[in-house]
Amino acid sequence: MFVAWRDLRFAKGRFALMGTVVVLITALVGMLSGLTAGLGRENVSAVTGLPADRLAFSAPADGQELSFTDSSVTEEQWRRWAAAPGVESAEPLGVTTVRAEADGRTASVSAFGVRPGSGLAPQEDALRDGRAVLSEGAAEELGLTPGEDLVLSGGRELKVAAVSGDASYSHTPVVWTSLDDWQHLARPAAGGDANGPRATVIALTTADGFDDTDRAAADEAAGTETATRDDALQAIGSFAAENGSLQLMRGFLFVISALVVGAFFTVWTIQRSGDVAVLKALGASTGHLLRDALGQALVLLAAGTAAGTAIAAALGAAVGGSVPFVLDAETVAVPALVMTALGTAGAALSVRRITSVDPLTALGSAR
């Protein structure tokens, strides 16, 4: 690293400029990662927080994907799943977006209907017909506390039994209601028929030995299509579109960082060809020169990503109260490590030229 440190001191301006680029890209990736995680949490936290490992949807039409919006399951389907081998618990869950009013305030909320005692809702002991459990976001937007009343779409009046959790769905706070109350809210879209009243999906808790064969047999018997809880997130339309776009942007930033670092060290290596030739003529091995060049790249990347990560963390902490932003190791440290790895890969590809430098040719051309 002797030559690498001398280069860093000699060409301070060049390396400072490149380091600034790394800092800015790292900060941008860190901010985008935190924002992606925050927006995703506002989209899906109510679903990821369910004490279930699978969700059963009504079977979609040919060529269509699973969707919470289009799904509607019957009581008969729920009972078939409850009796299926390997299923420890099967509970109907209604999901719909409604308008809530209270004391002159209005807000869009997601009504989640569950059977009292099902274990799906927070503080479920307070939940029954005519009562609702509000997420903290819903209570804040409507200015409600336990014991007060709210009116949901269609004139359905409910009393706030409790305020608990920060669940949200499709960027709207969640209001937990009884399944009977939810069916009144969702009617006529989820009205009853000969097979009984409907819900949106069936939340399933399955035994350890429950496999794809068991799932396929139960799906066929009930006329449903089942997905794991994580896979079911793609059935939330806003999440699939939003998360895909943001992840694509983040991926492009990673690729750009590797290209920028690689381009810088390609030019730098070309400019140093004469110096490399002299070192080779003096007996320096190719491996030593490669380690020296890669060490130089690692120093630059480590310093740049550390500074960029610190900036992203500081900005994330500052805006966390006003925008959906998740500040943790996964959203800040992981992008920095990926940036360092990709930048090192780009630098490694660029410094390969060192292996092809012929000391006699380079020294002869220098004369």
Enumerate the language-model features and the residues they cover.
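N-terminal Sec/SRP start-transfer signal
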Residues: 1-29, 40, 367
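Alpha-helical transmembrane segments of integral membrane proteins
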Residues: 18-28, 246-263, 300, 304, ...
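Hydrophobic, regular-secondary-structure patches
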Residues: 26-107
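Hydrophobic secondary-structure segments that place a key small or acidic residue at a functional site
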Residues: 93-96, 101-116, 121-188
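Mechanotransmission and gating elements of multispan inner-membrane complexes involved in transport
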Residues: 155, 164-253
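Short helix-loop junctions at transmembrane helix boundaries
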Residues: 291-341, 348-366
